[in-house]
Amino acid sequence: MAYKVNLHITQKCNYACKYCFAHFDHHNDLTLGQWKHIIDNLKTSGLVDAINFAGGEPVLHRDFAAIVNYAYDQGFKLSIITNGSLMLNPKLMPPELFAKFDTLGISVDSINPKTLIALGACNNSQEVLSYDKLSHLITLARSVNPTIRIKLNTVITNLNADEDLTIIGQELDIARWKMLRMKLFIHEGFNNAPLLVSQADFDGFVERHAEVSHDIVPENDLTRSYIMVDNQGRLLDDETEEYKVVGSLLAEDFGTVFDRYHFDEATYASRYAG
């Protein structure tokens, strides 16, 4: 099996989502040359055929476009997960770059501004990704790349578990909608426990949205099924709430590091089916 690796190329973000696990070093992103080395490492391993760019907010890496273009030129299937709020800024996201992605993933936890602000899914001016901006972004992406797949990621917490987002699926033709039960995360004093949601409330959210996307994917547990490389080029192990470093892709071959990662092959296969 060839794998998808999630490159968290920056931890910089214009949002401060209270559930987010991306609370590492915000200031010392790797250089373009270092990310090229990591991408070459993945290619040489023969184990990886797809890269997902994540963050933080990935477009905030100073060399975002160059990193994407390099990965594309190496033949990887590319996707991105973004909060969407900066994707209409051509200086950060040149529109032609949409053509390089097979999938555009957008984090959408609510379309209610009050909920989004309570979650921290807003910038310093409390501006959020409105439904109109979301629609505009999807329209732009499809105008550049008509075959691009639109995927939504919704993290279910106790702040949005009772909301109804079915209008998104009804109007925007979402190919895949991942509904993720928030994972408890503790790192360097950060703790998202106050937002934990019950299994019953999570199941209720999924049931309400079951008919509005071609592919609804509820995810209760992501443990050891998400291959994550942080903004320092390190493969992380999420077996416990405290993420641990498995090894550096700047210093070792990916295959060597991956062999030390107690990866859950079955859960991974179920996550990425289809």
Swiss-Prot record:
InterPro entries with a match to the protein in the record: Aldolase_TIM, RSAD2/Viperin_antiviral, rSAM
Q: Please list the GO terms describing molecular function.
A: 4 iron, 4 sulfur cluster binding; lyase activity; metal ion binding
Q: Which domain of life is it from?
A: Bacteria
Q: Which residues form the Radical SAM core domain?
A: 1-215
Q: Which residues form a coiled coil?
A: none
Question: Which UniProt key words apply to this protein?
Answer: 4Fe-4S, Antiviral defense, Iron, Iron-sulfur, Lyase, Metal-binding, S-adenosyl-L-methionine
Q: What protein is this chain from?
A: S-adenosylmethionine-dependent nucleotide dehydratase
Q: Which organism is it from?
A: Selenomonas ruminantium
- Which gene holds the coding sequence for this protein? vip6
